Design a protein with these regions (language model features):
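Short, small/acidic-rich helices and loops at N termini and domain boundaries
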Residues: 1-92, 362, 367-380
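Glycine-biased, small-residue-rich flexible motifs in mid-sequence functional cores and linkers
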Residues: 2-5, 87-380
Length: 380
């Protein structure tokens, strides 16, 4: 193990033992030197005498750990699991993130980190999204990724996870930023996305492996999401959405903010509409975001959806029904009437339901409150 890797081993020990944050860590470094020197003082039982009284409890904890733990062995086991550690001094540390105030001194990651020369967008929004929000997250995630834009988000339920899945489905790159250790899939229902991020993209966190998700860890995480990106795109957000925390941090960091407009009566768009009123860039298509980033679209968003669907375009009644769907949920009565007008022949309710259920099972369509809509991205 090189001298640099040995220092990282002691850093890892320090982080997982004391739970050191960015500011606290820098104070300790200024007072006590390197992580290895802190370890040596802890092992000798003199650390609490060298640090500020505010850190006495942590110092005592470190002194106990220094006498009992295998520092280098623990670090090597972490590396064997495919988890790496970077510091602000490493050339591989993301430059965009390094430039922001209070960038995390240590960054754990698995998979691949984003390519610095490519544009990056944080695609974020509410967890309990509407059918329209799901569709837009999929459409923007796929189209931006196809144009070479990196999609960064928190792998949360709803908008975040849908946009990241769409980016991977389109053959692009996505990075998940966690409010827990990178070895923990949270929420657990997103395990398929987590596994794909590890294989085709990456995940990162300032918290050491094994750190369980807690509510207090997620707001600080948001500064990393925005810090890694050129801009933040808000798909849907309620009035008091946690998404707006990321927006505030993005503005502090000098990042661009984009928002999709929504209906005035839509509670899930109150946050977006307010952002637009306050100066966020209104966008209605991926091409508008690409124009802001000065990136060339590879195809239109609607074309991206069509190409994905044409690979496995269903035949017969399901295929005919697919052409009648869009991102606004439609009840059975409306679809039955639209089918009769489009194909000049009636369809029974049972036949209609059977065809729609086939589309839902294949991932082409979704259902909400008895109405059906186009998902835009097949989750297969």
């Amino acid at each position: 193990m090189t001298e640099r890797e040995q220092e990282k081993a002691y850093l890892h020990w320090l982080y997982r033992t004391a739970g050191v944050g960015s500011r606290g860590f820098m104070r300790r470094m200024e007072q006590a030197g390197t992580a290895r020197e802190i370890y040596e003082m802890a092992r000798a039982g003199i650390l609490e005498d060298r640090l500020d009284v505010r850190y006495k409890e942590k110092a005592q904890k470190l002194q106990v750990a220094a006498r009992t733990e295998d520092v280098t062995g623990e670090y090597e086991r972490m590396r064997e699991r495919g988890i790496s550690l970077l510091t602000l001094q490493d050339a591989a540390y993301p430059r965009k993130l390094a430039a922001v105030r209070d960038a995390p001194y240590v960054l754990y990651y698995a998979g691949r980190l984003p390519e610095e020369e490519r544009g990056a967008i944080a695609l974020i929004g509410t967890r309990k999204c509407s059918a329209y929000g799901r569709a837009m997250a999929g459409e923007f995630g796929a189209a931006l990724a196809e144009a070479g834009i990196l999609i960064v988000s928190g792998m949360a339920r709803g908008i975040d996870g849908i946009g990241q899945w769409a980016a991977l489905q389109a053959g692009g790159y996505s990075l998940g930023v966690f409010g827990c250790g990178v070895d923990i899939c949270y929420p657990s229902e997103n395990m398929p996305l987590y596994e794909r991020l590890l294989a085709e993209g990456g995940v990162c966190s300032e918290y050491p492996p094994g750190t369980a998700p807690r509510a207090a860890l997620f707001p600080p995480r948001n500064r990393i999401i925005s810090g890694l990106c050129d801009g933040v795109l808000v798909i849907e957000a309620k009035e008091r959405s946690g998404t707006l925390i990321t927006v505030d941090m993005a503005l502090e960091q000098g990042r661009e903010v984009y928002a999709l407009p929504g209906r005035a009566t839509d509670a899930l768009s109150v946050g977006c509409n307010r952002l637009i009123r306050q100066g966020a860039a209104l966008v209605t298509s991926p091409e508008e975001v690409l124009e802001e980033l000065q990136a060339e679209p590879t195809r239109s968003a609607s074309a991206a959806v069509c190409v994905q669907q044409s690979l496995f375009l269903p035949e017969g009644l399901p295929g005919e029904l697919l052409k009648l769907l869009d991102y606004t949920p439609k009840p059975l009565e409306l679809l039955q009437e639209a089918y009769r007008e489009a194909y000049k022949t009636p369809v029974t309710v049972s036949g209609l339901c059977h065809g729609l259920l086939q589309l839902c099972a294949a991932g082409y369509a979704g259902q909400t409150a008895g109405a059906y809509y186009l998902t835009g991205v097949r989750h297969t």
